[in-house]
């Protein structure tokens, strides 16, 4: 894939993940507000996440979108502010994105399984 195509694909991925994150944040906030106003404790909320297959899937997708979005954003910041480009920068940012995804998925697993 050419450099121009790679940049275009990353640009699209950044915008798509931003759109997904907006939806995920709205659902998360609405759910938390509804649960707290309904008098649910943290323990009761966790019990409900354990009983559903939808919540782990929702939060796993949320984490993956955030990790991808964050990694692409860090790559852009490194290039624009630090002048750090090339394979080394790409590999470092990819490793950070994978680490963020792994930590986030571990957190999802911890509260839903």
Enumerate the language-model features and the residues they cover.
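Membrane-embedded alpha-helical bundles that constitute the cytochrome b-like, heme-associated redox core
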Residues: 1-113
